[in-house]
Amino acid sequence: MADQLTEEQIAEFKEAFSLFDKDGDGSITTKELGTVMRSLGQNPTEAELQDMINEVDADGNGTIDFPEFLNLMARKMKDTDSEEELKEAFKVFDKDQNGYISAADWRHVMTNLGEKLTDEEVDEMIREADVDGDGQVNYEEFVKMMMAK
């Protein structure tokens, strides 16, 4: 995961890590995490801090080291990127920008992509993604469908 980061991103994250790692020992404790979060106006409980550490503490030593921190940041970035990409993709399909992808919208985009689909195939694709059964695909349904791929 972290191997997909640029050198610039790694340098930025190293700086951020140093802000958390108050005593400079190369690891972030729950106490250090709490200090930083409180300085940002958050008020996490000790249990919440422990949960946050445990979530990324790959070696189970109770603290976050830099490689673990990098993995966390890379995961968060990937989530953000894919959400933006999904919004853009949805806009491409939602021709009339009404918040829904109709069979006509779907057919139009697929044809432009060079996909020769029959009306039945288009209807079937819409049906598969159309969770609430209203005959069109809203953003939530689109995200579910894309994430399932």
UniProtKB/Swiss-Prot annotation:
Q: Where is the EF-hand domain?
A: 8-43, 44-79, 81-116, 117-149
One Pfam family, short name: EF-hand_7
- Provide GO CC annotations from the record: myosin II complex
Residues that the record marks as modified (N-acetylalanine) are A2
Q: Which GO terms describe its molecular function?
A: calcium ion binding
Residues recorded as binding Ca(2+) 3, renumbered to this chain, are D94, D96, N98, Y100, D105
Tell me the domain of life.
Eukaryota
- Provide the residue positions that the database annotates as binding Ca(2+) 4: D130, D132, D134, Q136, E141
The family assignment reads: Belongs to the calmodulin family.
Q: Can you say what this protein is called?
A: Calmodulin
Organism ancestry: Eukaryota, Viridiplantae, Streptophyta, Zygnematophyceae, Zygnematophycidae
